[in-house]
Structures are given as structure tokens and as C-alpha cells.
């Protein structure tokens, strides 16, 4: 027997074929959301208040300080917030101190700063009753970037950019004449020496002494027309503020505020870290030849001779001294922007590009600026200019912008913080204004602070930001993946149109950080990614991945695990997870396959620094659920990973027989299961609640403590209309641990993810019904509810105040018979449990109609009965097409009962209709290997091919779907599944470490099957065996959320667009089918003139003609001649608006007069035609036309 048994949770054992032992548990998969939000509450908010505190008025007399803050308790719990359509939030209170410096008076006050949305335990937010997820954003890290460029003549040059978190950009570039230019904040370019002069290095000689003599600097100085600091400052001022009269003082303050004011320029801690790392002197000294002797300033000891090569060992020896002051220079710029001294570190080396090797260049570092300095400093600017000149001489490296060392994540906490900062800075402006207006003696903090801008910016972020998304809740895996999604789009990120191939491509630094498989197909490919399974995010927002440390002395793999960012990993040689180890942790083989900076190489074992922790650290959670991933083509694996997220939760879920061992972890962390919070013993289990008696530790003894109640969700509608239902899987008396699963959620079985069902599949054709990936299925799957799913749809009706009076929800509806009202209660609302079909009443509602001129008869009635017969219109809520089912629940909200309703709404009724959908022809199904298809035929069980023992198979797939698509994983899954079913096992075949081909054959033999796993099949119709043996086995098949019931649509008459009078398009608008240009050609080709005329006129936009035709059909008369299509009139109007005089002539040259729609109405009245055109259908048209416009945008 191959493999070993592994326990997953309490209820499931699997035979695992893994050979590599797991040294690291998977982290909590939604930690990226929860820990980031926790950081925001603990530190992010405090940072924000510290940034703007204190706020002083323009005279400096009043000062407002933010001292402390606290979050209260949420108003409603999570479930109630969803029901009531409110935001799940807690009040934020801030302790504020107002100090009057004249009188010395101090006022403290607690100020309410609005309700702040709170993250639920599962990493989501409830905003206005809808569950939303904030997606993490991948952006360029603030830093300094150098890149090479080639101009049109083939001359090589360089560009460099200093990118802050917020503030002005600095860009350096070379031109064809070897002059170095600088751009400040995207303005016109200046010679770079102008900037140096403005910093206080006024003369040519000072600049040459600073940067070092070289031809590029000479060319630049020749181009530079300014001779001293003042002229340079004026030159820069003219570029930044063209048209304003320049003065030296203004120029100084402008430059100072642009770059050296922490309020205007912010690198953030990550930017400071990256710049210090990039501009550090040691990176450029590596392997260079010294042009000066390095001496220890304290002892006078010679550390490195002039002319020595600084290899790794020499550099390591010199490094401690470099940190402590070798080459440190204090410069005192005069008259520049900055008056303080500038500390630099400068060392001379020989230029590697120089042939004679005599030319020296200065390497300048920025001399270790503390992490707290968030703005750029003159030494940063000088060091970055020096780096640029060094690059021209072949010293230093250019950067790869797509490397994950240069891209970082903004998670929930930081995105919220940035939004909160915008709100606070708006508030700060208001506070300053109020300080100067109001009486300083009587003023209180409460009167100064206007919290509106803060609340507005937070609301805007959660409600309409691109990164705040309606949670994909089709199944638990979709939830989990959505929370772990990384997007390069959004504010401050890329746009789909601008993003090129390079950004979207898989990069070697993605290894273990971002999944190379899971990304959408289509315009977002490569811009939206998924976090790898073991990845974490560090405090700077860079993605780290864990590696096992190899001890450099002994060469053994140690238990120590280091998390490395992408640029840290570039310094090490990393072995694969499948490198063979001895029991003591040493490598078996002398040469090891390893990675170094994206190159796969074979290295001697003593050169290995780290080793992968697990084979699945490359891929995301969803991709890790695909068994035999290593045997699939990556394009198909991508489809497989994406389609698992579209699986509809079934009525009877079943976890896969062939799994990967990832099912348990994914289900547990997704938030769909009920997880035990404390160890204890189960006391009572009901359908809706589970009670667990806690175990407390007292003096090392286990003692029974409090009773915890866990509530289960029963038949709740998910965001996507699937059924969200939890079922207990523990029994009374079970002892449970913390973190154990107490109840399965949707698409779960025994604590494991269960997206589909294990069915018996044969690869064979059958009368051509499975042509082009179609699927043939046995009727057994319909009869036994194998693929039956439950769907819940929500409909709502609101009674509003109108100009003519309030709408009313009532049972008394004009022109509706008692039969249609039989399921409504006395309020006019449908009863729970009633079965409804398309068009049935759900909520009876009437709206007052406008007062019209009364006819003589009505006046007579009015005179007799006194009160006018009630003028109301029926605006009841009815079941839309394809929406029939059983009423699951009805919720009524009244303004009188204190429910929060939108303005103008008095009453709101929500009706939930549940449908049980069996699988049918036209539904889409898929396996886990990207093998998708549509059901083309459901055969009676007796017609399906059957095995020698008489068992009919369930599904027939086309064998031609395998070879060209190269997803062989499905065939291996099929064989292993059959063997496992026969042995009564569940198996786990982890990705990249699963069952090999030999393991599959051994398991087949163990199950007593033939080695090729094929079998004779008999035709169910004739009983004859098929000519060839067929591959039959167990495959895990999933029903996807593209069901034919949602797509089927038919229309006879319906709404028309206002302008063209043509039917609207699309199922949502109850639209027609577009008969387009090409379809017209087809009818023209057949010469079907009358059919064509009908389609273009009475079936589309001949307004009068279609009414007459309708009437003729009803009365049984002949259909009249078509008139003029409305769109033709629109075309004429358009030509007339361009100033053309358009006339329509008949065949005998007589002008035909085109009447407008209004004229047609009069004509109709005279002809006595009744158009179905009361206010209601008109209203429908305009509303739908508006929606039409919205969808088109």
C-alpha cells in the first residue's frame, strides 16, 4: 500500500500520497484582512490624530489637541444589521483638549466623531445591510528607481525617479548630448546642476568637488546658465510657477515646502526604508577597485589599500567601519534652501568603464537617515544624483519595476487610514476657520469640530471605492478567495487600458507570494491576483514567504523558518521543497536544483542558503484544491481554479474522494463554518443553536465553566442568491477543542469543502450528443437530487409619499379578482409557504392617480354617490418571469415602529422566494481541471451505457476534450477515484507532491482493477458491448452558477426605448432579441422581403403600425400595411439638425409629409384606436429607458 492515513478534523480520514513532510502549518487564510484592520484600530488611527495634532489658529493663540480615542459597542449585532439594512458600526469618541495660550485656560471634552464601520470576525464589512470586502491593492512602493533607456539613434541612457507616498516627483534623465537633466514635479527639464546650486552648492568648483570630475558633469555645467545659488533658485521658481514674479525668498520657501515639509511631502516609513536601502554606499562598492586608502578614523589602522578590489570578504570587513564614519563628510551649503549642515558619505573608486582604469568617481551615500524622517533630505537628493552619475560609469544597478520588492500591498488598514486622513485634513481646515471667527473665551472643542467631512470620506470609501466590493458569496471558496485578492487597479494604481504586458506577466519574484495560476481571464488578466497559501504581509506592506534556513556551518536544514521579502530573497540560493534530506537534515545529493534570482541552476550543496517549506507555497488556496495540478496545462488550471469559485452549493454536498488535503483548511478559514471559540463539551444541539460548556483551567485542573451559545444560520440568502445554511456536525457529549468546526456551512461536508459531487464518468462519444464539450447525463442525477441546489431571491416593495398622496399597501386592488388575492393576508402581503408562479401578486399596493377631467357619466355618478370613486392605480409587486417558487419569509418595516427607512418611504416589505432547481439541459458543469461543458441531453437511466456488473454510468464526456487541452490531471483523477471508491477510501493528493503515476497503478491493482483502468461498457439501448474498452472512473463534477433558468427569456410585447421606440435589450429590461445588420443581410440573401419589412417596422418601431397590427390579430382581421419606423424619423431630425433640408418623395415625385408622434396621437383619437398607453406603461418606458442609458454607460 502506498501513502499514509491522515486525519482532517474530527470526521474525515484520507490516505495521503504526500512524500514531503509539512514543517509549517498553513497560516490563518484571512489574516491579511483581520490583522490589517486591527493595526488600523490600534495604531493607524492614533498616527492620524498625531499627524494633525495640534491644530493652531493663524495667530497661534488657540491650540486643539487630540489626546485619545475609543470605540464603543456596535448598535446592532451583525445579523440584525443585515436585516435592517444598516451599517455594522461602532461610535468613535475622541478626547479633545482646547488650550487658550493667552489665558492659559484648558478645556477637555469627549467628541463624537461618527459611526465607524467594524470588521466582522470573518474579515468583511456590513455596509447598508450588504456584506462587502475591501480588496488589498498592489502599488509601486515609494522609493528611488533607476532604469535604462535607448533613444531612437540607439544611444544608451538612463532615467531615474524619486517617487514619494505623496508629494512632488523628482526625475533625472540623460539626453543625446550626455547632459543630465532634472524635472521637478513633471515640469520642463532643467540641468541637474541647477538643483545642486539651489541646495547651496553655488559655484562650479563646489559641484565638481562634490560629485567628482567627469565628462557628463562638464557637459551639464556647460548647459547650465546659472552661475550661483540665487540665479538657480529663480530659474527653478520660474519653471514651477510660470508667470509669477520670482524672488529668491519665494523660491526658497517654495522648494522648502515642496520637498522638506513633512506635511506636503511624505515618503512613509516604507519609502524611507527603501531609499536608505537603495542609496546605501555598500551596494555600489561591491567588486569595485578603491581609488583611496580606507583608514579607521579612530586608530589610524589601514583597512583597505588604494587599488584593492572590494570583494565580499573585504567589504564585510570594512562594513562596520562604513557604518561608523569612514568617508563621512559634513558640508555647509550657503544661501541654499537648507541652512543646516548636510552629512554625506563619499568614497572614491576607479570607474569600471574607463579603459586605462585611471578615472576616479565619487560614490556618495545618504549617510543613514533615521527611520522617523518621512520627508526627503538634501543628502538623499545628492546621493540619488551621485547614483545616477555612477550608473553612467557602470556602477550600480537599474531596477525592475515589476519585481515584488518594488511593489507593495495597501491592505484595509492603510486604505482606510488614507481615506481618514483626507477627511481629517478637510476637518482641520474647518477648525482653523472657526477658530478665527468665533469668540475665543466661550468656545468649546465641540463647537470647533465639524465631523461631516470625516464621515463623508469614510462613507464614500466603503460605498463607492473601486476597492470596496460586494462580496462574492457563491460558496465558501469564493468568499475566501475574495478576501485574499490583490488588485493592481483602483485609485493610485493602474488602469486596464494603460497596463502593458510586462505588468500582467508572471515574474520570478511572485514565487511563494502571488499565485501564478489564479487570475481572471479577459481584460483584467494579471492585474488581479491571489495571495499564495503561505504568504504574509510585513509591516512595510511587502509580501513575504517562508523558507527553511540552512545552517552555513553544517550545511543542514534547521527547524528555523525565516520570512523573506522578494528583494531579500535575491541575495540567497534557495533549494526546492522536494530536495531529498537525510534524517539529520543534511542533503542527500551533492548537487541540488536551486533558484537564484529567477534562474534555475544546479549548485553544490554547500552553496544552498534556504529551502522551500512546502510544494504548495507557490499557489493560492483555490489552486491548491486541484489534485494532479502538476499534470495540467497552466491555462486549464487557471480555468479550474476560477470555476471552483462559481460552484453552486448543492442540497446534499459531498467532499471529493480525490482531494488535496486543502479542503479542510479552506472550509475552516472561509468564515462559512461555525468554529468553536473555547475548549469544552457539547451540552445541547438543535438545528439553530449549539450549546458548549466551557472548560476553564483552575490550578492546572479542568473545571466546567460558562455555557457558550453558537447560533446557526438557516436558509439565508447569500449575496449571490444561493442558499446559506449551516448544519451541526457534533453530537451531545463530544469534547471539542478551540478552533474545531461545530457546524458545516454551505458547500461543506464533515468540515471539508464540498463544491460538487463524485459521479461515475466515462470518456466516450454517444450519437454525437457530446460534440464540442457537451455533457450527457443520466436521469438518475435528476431523480435523486444529486445536483439540486436551492436559490433564494429577494423582492421588495416600498410605499412612498407621492405628490398626490401616500401609496398604500392593501388587499383592495382595482380590477383584480378574488382568485388572484387568495394567498394574500388582510394586509395585502403574501403568506409564508404559498407557492407562486410568474405574474402572481406578492404585495398589493395602490398609488393615487392624477385628477383628470371627468366625463358626463362620472359627473353623474359623483353627483349621486357624493364621493368620487377612488382614483388609484395598481402598482403591486408581482413575481417576475422565471421567479416562481415558495415564499420562504416576509419582512415588514414600518416608519411608525421606529424602523430606519429612506426618506419618503413609509413602509417596506421584503419577500423571499425560494426555488429548488434540479439540473437540466443547458446548465453548465465543470471538473476541477478546466474541463467545462454544457449539458446537452439527459438520458433515461436504462439508455446509459453500463458496466459489466450492470451499474449504469452517470455522465459521458467527450474524449476529444483531453488531448489538445493537455489537462491530463482529469484522467488521473478518474482512475484514482475509481480505485479509492472500490477500496472505500478518501484520498489526498497534494499539489506538486501528490500521487505519481506508479502510485495510481499500484492503488488500481490494490483495488483489483486492470492496470489500464479501462473496462468493457455495454450499450444500454441494445445490450451489445461497445467495440473498444472505455476509461470509466469517479470524477468530481461541479454545477456552476450559470444556470439555464437564469438565462431563458421570451417577450411578446414589452417596454420600448423613449428615443428610438425600439424594444429594449436584455433580460433585465424584459427586452427583445436584436435583429442586427448581419441578420438583415441573411434575409436579403433569401429575398424574404415581407418578413424583413415586418421585422423592421411593426415588430420594432412603427408605433402606429404595431398597435394596429396587435388589434388586427386580436380581432382576426388582416394585418394592415406597415407605416414609417420611428428611427427613420429620428434620422431625418438628425440630418435636419445638421442644417440639411430633407424631403421624402413618393415614386411619382410627390412629397410625403412625416408626422410627429404627437400628431399621430391626435390621428389615433380621431380614428378611435385605443392604444395600450395609460400612464403605467409610459412610466415603465421612461424608467427602463433611464436604466438603459445607465447600462450603456
Curated annotation (Swiss-Prot):
Residues 1184-1193 have a biased composition (Basic and acidic residues). Transmembrane segments: none annotated. It is an enzyme of class 2 (transferase). Residues 1153-1193 are annotated as: Disordered. The keyword Cytoplasm does not apply. One of its GO terms (cellular component) is DNA-directed RNA polymerase complex. Pfam families: RNA_pol_Rpb2_1, RNA_pol_Rpb2_2, RNA_pol_Rpb2_3, RNA_pol_Rpb2_45, RNA_pol_Rpb2_6, RNA_pol_Rpb2_7. InterPro entries: DNA-dir_RNA_pol_bsu_ext_1_sf, DNA-dir_RNA_pol_bsu_external_1, DNA-dir_RNA_pol_su2, DNA-dir_RNAP_su2_dom, DNA-dir_RNAP_su2_hyb_sf, RNA_pol_bsu_bac, RNA_pol_bsu_CS, RNA_pol_bsu_protrusion. Its EC number is 2.7.7.6. One of its GO terms (biological process) is DNA-templated transcription. Residues 1153-1162 have a biased composition (Acidic residues). One of its GO terms (molecular function) is DNA-directed RNA polymerase activity. CDD domains: RNA_pol_B_RPB2. It comes from the Bacteria. Keywords: DNA-directed RNA polymerase, Nucleotidyltransferase, Transcription, Transferase. The keyword Transmembrane does not apply. It catalyses: RNA(n) + a ribonucleoside 5'-triphosphate = RNA(n+1) + diphosphate. DNA-dependent RNA polymerase catalyzes the transcription of DNA into RNA using the four ribonucleoside triphosphates as substrates. The RNAP catalytic core consists of 2 alpha, 1 beta, 1 beta' and 1 omega subunit. When a sigma factor is associated with the core the holoenzyme is formed, which can initiate transcription. Belongs to the RNA polymerase beta chain family. This is DNA-directed RNA polymerase subunit beta. It comes from Bacillus licheniformis (strain ATCC 14580 / DSM 13 / JCM 2505 / CCUG 7422 / NBRC 12200 / NCIMB 9375 / NCTC 10341 / NRRL NRS-1264 / Gibson 46). The lineage of its organism: Bacteria, Bacillati, Bacillota, Bacilli, Bacillales.
